[in-house]
Every structure is written in C-alpha cells, then in structure tokens.
Swiss-Prot record:
Its main location: Golgi. It is a multi-pass membrane protein. Golgi membrane protein involved in vesicular trafficking. This is Golgi apparatus membrane protein TVP23. Belongs to the TVP23 family. It comes from the Eukaryota. InterPro entries: TVP23-like. Glycans are attached at residues 80, 101, 177. The keyword RNA-binding does not apply. It comes from Coccidioides immitis (strain RS). One of its GO terms (biological process) is protein secretion. Keywords: Glycoprotein, Golgi apparatus, Membrane, Transmembrane, Transmembrane helix. It is found in: Golgi apparatus membrane. The chain crosses the membrane at residues 13-33, 35-55, 108-128, 133-153.
Length: 188
C-alpha cells in the first residue's frame, strides 16, 4: 500500500486542514463561479456579484488568516498620514519557534502561483472570444486581487529567508549557511 508522506498533496496531512479547505475553497470557488455560474444562475449580475464576493473573501482570508496559519507569513500596507507614503510591511513567524508543515507549504505556494496563471488564461480567452467588457472587467479585478497577494507573499517569503539567513550567519558559520542555502535551493 502507498505510504503518505508529509509534503504530499493530501489535505489530510495538513497541520491546519480547516484553514486549508477554506483557502482552497475560496480560490477554486471563485474560478468555478466565473466559469460555470451562468449555467446554474440565469442572472448575470448575480453571477458577477457572487464571483466578486468569493474573490474578496479569498483575498481577505489568504492575506489575514491562511498565510499566517499555513506558512507563517503575513503582510499589510501602512500609509503615513503626514506624507501620504505607502509602505508594505512583512511579518514572518520565527523559524526557531514554529515549524511549517510541508503539505501546507506545498498547497499554499502551488495555489498562490497557479491561481493568477489561471486568471491570466481566462483573460486571454475573454479577449479572444470578444466577450462583453463586463466579463473582462471581472477577470481584471480577479487578476488585481490574486497578483497583489502573490507579489506580497513572494516578497514576504524573500524577506523572511533573508532575515533568517542574516541572523543565522551572524550566530554561526556563514560558509555552511551559504552552501546549505545554494544546494538547498538547487535540490529542493
């Protein structure tokens, strides 16, 4: 019989299965509502609103809950009221106090990068089929929301890895950390 290992794409191996199911549910739900909503609901406006609500729920849930629970990353935007400058703030859990489940990590990053790619494909399809502008605007909104989360979490992950590398380099052998980092990336 096939033995399941941590890191396999099986939601039962998740450390946070409810969080993972809601995360994937919002992501898949918005795509399915966009693709098949008109087959079950005759009112276009209702399909548009339901898709928009699912996209908004996905954005909020990923940004504030799933990112923190599944991979220990969180981001937000702060605006300086006196100057009007906007700064992105990244937060990551301490790797010494929290271990990230490999299954959660795989689901998170795979879904994070696959969803914008699917929406880009749907945008190209909408342009080729010359659908109404309103459908294309919905895809545009979906792209803005999913790409924003993708870019923010990618930056947050890079920031997290850089700060972990810097702190471990100061406390231990920099050569072993550099070697481990290079070979770890190549053979992951």
């Amino acid at each position: 019989m096939d033995q399941q290992r941590t890191g396999d794409l099986n939601w039962r191996l998740s450390a946070h299965p409810i969080t993972l199911l809601f995360f994937l549910g919002f992501r898949i739900g918005s795509l399915l509502m966009y693709l098949f909503g008109v087959l079950f609901i005759s009112d276009f406006v209702l399909v548009f609103i339901l898709t928009l609500l699912l996209l908004s729920a996905d954005f909020y849930y990923l940004k504030n809950i799933a990112g923190r629970r599944l991979v220990g990353l969180r981001w937000w935007n702060e605006v300086n009221t006196s100057t009007g400058d906007s700064n992105w703030v990244f937060e990551s859990s301490d790797p010494n106090t929290r271990t990230i489940n490999a299954t959660d990590k795989r689901f998170f990053w795979l879904s994070l990068y696959a969803t914008p790619a699917l929406w880009i494909g749907l945008a190209i399809l909408a342009i080729i089929r010359l659908q109404s502008v309103i459908w294309l605007s919905l895809v545009g909104i979906a792209l803005i929301l999913t790409v924003t989360n993708t870019l923010a979490f990618s930056r947050c992950d890079r920031f997290s890895q850089a700060s972990t590398f810097a702190s471990s380099a100061l406390s231990g052998g920099i050569t072993s950390n550099l070697t481990r980092g290079v070979f770890g990336r190549l053979f992951r």
